[in-house]
């Protein structure tokens, strides 16, 4: 018996906020709730019809029990429905969609909301004090750096893995800066043209000066120039090539997708954004974690029965320009179809949400262009990648 066709009935995301920016005091589950509500409203599905919510999140410390459940309840799902969070680092938001697809394919659910959420701004500092401190100072650990951005095997920052990739793939500082500039310029043009408007659900932030409606990505740098990027010093290795300008940011945001079978969508009169054709995850050396999309994309393409030449649009997360350039070179796809509206270097990288964010951006741009076959992929800390092939019906 063949598996049923699983479709993405609707998708939505919040804007991406800068570190300590518009969402600086907003908890991740509040952003997640907004994305959940939006996908239900866009598809005309009642909250009580959702079987389960699955949300990726990398930095849940201090947010209370099961932030995914908090997001689901805040979005109006009845208490009888369930929700849970998962963590595959930067791939979490896309892996959550794959998990939702699997639950529907096995008959364990009919309707799933899946995606990711993250507040890097609200990630707390912590200290291990249960054994007591007899005297003297005690070091606080930044959970954002420790749990989100430091390699667990070699003990260094993700930026060093990008330096490793740059050396192994012989990528110059100039190549990386030019890639970063292109990302910024494409994102600026897309934002000015309103091309992100269909993706983004406005989110109201309450401030002492009144309510602020956040409906634009905050991190995109308008007017970026090669000269301004080239002036930045290396951020992780003083002799290196990776800078704050050719790396993604620290960001806040959420994104979600509503999943069901193609038959269920037809029964409800819903025109899906796309069907999920295949997905895959793969491991690589943690020292070059940014190359994870290379084997993951190849596996997903093989499972789909596609070749690289079949792909009409790609969203490949830009953790760093170095790894993004290496992925493009090794996979050999047409760079003109990759991140056509800019990527994470410009838009930002709220780590647990980014997988669902790139999927959202891919789906809406495929619809806008009228193309059929697309691929979303991300590198993952610890030496992994995840990829998904989708097809418009």
UniProtKB/Swiss-Prot annotation:
One of its GO terms (biological process) is poly-hydroxybutyrate biosynthetic process. It comes from the Bacteria. The active site is at residues 90, 349, 379. Pfam families: Thiolase_C (PF02803), Thiolase_N (PF00108). SUPFAM superfamilies: Thiolase-like (SSF53901). Homotetramer. This is Acetyl-CoA acetyltransferase. It comes from Rhizobium meliloti (strain 1021). The lineage of its organism: Bacteria, Pseudomonadati, Pseudomonadota, Alphaproteobacteria, Hyphomicrobiales.
């Amino acid at each position: 018996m063949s598996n049923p066709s699983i479709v993405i009935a609707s998708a939505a995301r919040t804007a991406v906020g800068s570190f300590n920016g518009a969402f600086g005091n907003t908890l991740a589950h509040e952003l997640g709730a907004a994305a959940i509500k939006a996908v239900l409203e866009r598809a005309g599905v009642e909250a009580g019809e959702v079987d389960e919510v699955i949300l990726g999140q990398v930095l849940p410390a201090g947010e209370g029990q099961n932030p995914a459940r908090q997001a689901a309840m805040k979005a109006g799902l009845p208490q009888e429905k369930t929700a849970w969070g998962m963590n595959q680092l930067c791939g979490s938001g896309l892996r959550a969609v794959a998990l939702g697809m699997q639950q529907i394919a096995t008959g364990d659910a009919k309707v799933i909301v899946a995606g990711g959420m993250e507040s890097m701004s609200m990630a707390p500092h912590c200290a291990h004090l249960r054994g007591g401190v007899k005297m003297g100072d005690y070091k606080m650990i930044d959970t954002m750096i420790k749990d989100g951005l430091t390699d667990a095997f070699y003990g260094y920052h993700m930026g060093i893995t990008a330096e490793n990739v740059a050396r192994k793939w012989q990528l110059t500082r100039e190549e990386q800066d030019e890639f970063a500039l292109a990302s910024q310029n494409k994102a600026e043009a897309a934002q000015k043209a309103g091309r992100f408007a269909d993706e983004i659900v406005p989110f109201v932030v309450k401030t002492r000066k009144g309510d602020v409606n956040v409906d634009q990505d905050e991190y995109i740098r308008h007017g970026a120039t090669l000269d301004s990027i080239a002036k930045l010093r290396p951020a992780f290795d003083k002799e290196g090539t990776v800078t704050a300008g050719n790396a993604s940011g620290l960001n806040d945001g959420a994104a979600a997708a509503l999943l069901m079978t193609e038959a269920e969508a037809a029964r409800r009169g819903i025109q899906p954004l796309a069907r999920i054709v295949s997905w895959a995850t793969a491991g690589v050396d943690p020292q070059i974690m940014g190359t994870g999309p290379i084997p993951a994309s190849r596996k997903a393409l093989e499972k789909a029965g596609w070749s690289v030449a079949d792909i009409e649009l790609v969203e490949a997360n830009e953790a760093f320009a170095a790894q993004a350039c290496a992925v493009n070179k090794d996979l050999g796809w047409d760079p003109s179809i990759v991140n056509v509206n800019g990527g994470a270097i410009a838009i930002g990288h709220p780590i647990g949400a980014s997988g669902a964010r790139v999927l959202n951006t891919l789906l809406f741009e495929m619809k806008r262009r009228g193309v059929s076959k697309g691929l979303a992929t991300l590198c993952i800390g610890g030496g992994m990648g995840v990829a998904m092939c989708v097809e418009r019906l």
